[in-house]
Amino acid sequence: MSKLVIGLTGGIGSGKTTITNYFLALGVEIIDADIIAREVVAINSPALKAIAKHFGDDYIQADGQLNRPLLRNRIFSNKADKLWLNKLLHPLIRVNIVTQTKEAKSPYCILVAPLLIENNLLELVDRVLIVDVNESTQITRTLVRDSSSEQEIKAIIASQTSRAARVNVADDIINNDDSPLSEIKEAVLSLDKKYLTLTKMV
């Protein structure tokens, strides 16, 4: 069991995946909240059946998987539906996160959760690492990566915790605006040493 759980988060397009991969290369175990969220609605899962019963069979694709775009559009414009879905999925996701952090074998592990703050997961981690960028960087990167429009990206940014609020809960921050990859790697190496030192104090 890891002695320390680091919560890694940041807004859309902040570069969380890049940072995560650097830690992974150092042998740090990664718990990915997005992967867990997909697993709890796997084909024939109780949660997926509950979604089909509540929203209708249109929300299940021909191959038996969840129709994510359809559901995403539904809950983005309907607060009541979003609340219902969160009440269904969040407890399941939380249980899986706790299980995986307990099973982690590296001295410290990292929980990557884009909505670490929004979904009240802070109590599951010992420290918070924020990948920080300005909004223009978020928009530019996401436009390149996704098929979303600038308006859609801005709506997602507006729905997430503000940059200031994220920084306010941070124990550690990596600025990923215009820094060269060599500097980002150095920042990760420095934090790795710091976290390993902290595990010896637990």
UniProtKB/Swiss-Prot annotation:
InterPro entries assigned to the protein according to its UniProt record, in alphabetical order: Depp_CoAkinase, P-loop_NTPase
Domain DPCK residues, every copy: 5-202
Protein residues bound to ATP: G13, S14, G15, K16, T17, T18
CDD domains, per database record: DPCK
Pathway as given in its UniProt record: Cofactor biosynthesis; coenzyme A biosynthesis; CoA from (R)-pantothenate: step 5/5
Main location: cytoplasm
Coiled-coil ranges (or none): none
Subcellular location as annotated: Cytoplasm
Entry EC no(s): 2.7.1.24
Transmembrane segments: none
Alphabetic keyword roster: ATP-binding, Coenzyme A biosynthesis, Cytoplasm, Kinase, Nucleotide-binding, Transferase
Protein name: Dephospho-CoA kinase
